[in-house]
């Protein structure tokens, strides 16, 4: 019996060795040197990489290699795509979809694992991203065993990562120095508020404990500015008390109270453009504001206003370079170009982006820009 198992293991090893040898010797594109063929593969458009990988084992190995995305970025071939996490209140359906910002075409992503499709509300989850690595992270939902998944754009696939140490719901998350932080929220079946914070390292697939929040904060909004993560609970009716907020310094590993001007003027969903904090206000004609740390004040951004007849709440906002993307009900998208004048004032110019007709009943819960 032992001899049969040994023989079987040897055969398996030999088969693997033969497959590796065949893959190495197999040209990527017949008649072309592999270095030239790789340049051709680098220009294959997203989201069809899953189909391209099925062409041959050599294509699959090349496209799934982390060096492939690095090469696209170093050659300035990677392009920004807008990813939207949307939900339908009537049917409780949730889905991710992506917009090619160059062509205006929309794609629906593969569904997330089942444990994430049975949640009570999309806001029970929290989403973060690593734009230049082309990865989306979806956390939470309360499932002890499957509380974290990652979407990799190059493979167009979801995969489970190590579960969070404290599975939670209704919390905020963000990418701080290449690590994904999960802050606060509710834990347990009774929804008990928590101040616990943890950080995920994608390099070794591990979670570690981070210094706790000094206080419980209701989920509203958060933003990562440089090496700091700002968390605010926002204003709450009847507006008798100013909102609370905390700022995490990743260099010091400590929390400090958010300045009064920052937390009191944070009256909308935020986006960080070139290390400056902006918000799209959720009242009136949805004016855009920018935070000025020098005097702890907010200033209105001049220029056009969002088209109120097309842009209806709820909003999800993200940014890339000097552009801001606002996703509204019906998955209507407005793209704003932000510019800074010589006097330090900011202005914005808006344009509407095509929205998928099939998503008219959907509303956004989160959005991110990835480079693919």
Swiss-Prot record:
Pfam family of the protein (one): F-box
Kelch repeats: 80-126, 135-178, 179-227, 229-276, 279-325
SMART domains: FBOX, Kelch
GO biological process: protein ubiquitination; red or far-red light signaling pathway; red, far-red light phototransduction
Cross-referenced InterPro entries: F-box-like_dom_sf, F-box_dom, Kelch-typ_b-propeller, Kelch_1
Key words, A-Z: Kelch repeat, Phytochrome signaling pathway, Repeat, Ubl conjugation pathway
SUPFAM superfamilies on file: F-box domain (SSF81383), Kelch motif (SSF117281)
Origin: domain of life: Eukaryota
Keyword Repeat: yes
Biased composition regions of type Polar residues, renumbered to the chain: 1-15
Induction text: Rhythmic expression with highest levels at the end of the dark phase, just before the transition to light. Induction by far-red light requires phyA.
Associated pathway: Protein modification; protein ubiquitination
F-box domain: residues covered: 29-74
Gene3D superfamilies (alphabetical): Kelch-type beta propeller
Region entry Disordered, spans: 1-27
Quaternary context: Part of a SCF (ASK-cullin-F-box) protein ligase complex. Interacts with SKP1A.
UniProt note: domains: The kelch repeats form a beta-propeller structure involved in protein-protein interaction. The F-box is required for the interaction with SKP1A.
Function, as annotated: Component of SCF (ASK-cullin-F-box) E3 ubiquitin ligase complexes, which may mediate the ubiquitination and subsequent proteasomal degradation of target proteins. Part of the phyA-mediated signaling transduction pathway leading to the regulation of gene expression and hypocotyls elongation in response to red and far-red light exposure.
PANTHER family in the cross-refs: OS02G0202900 PROTEIN (PTHR46344), OS07G0153400 PROTEIN (PTHR46344:SF4)
Name of the protein described by the UniProt record: F-box protein AFR
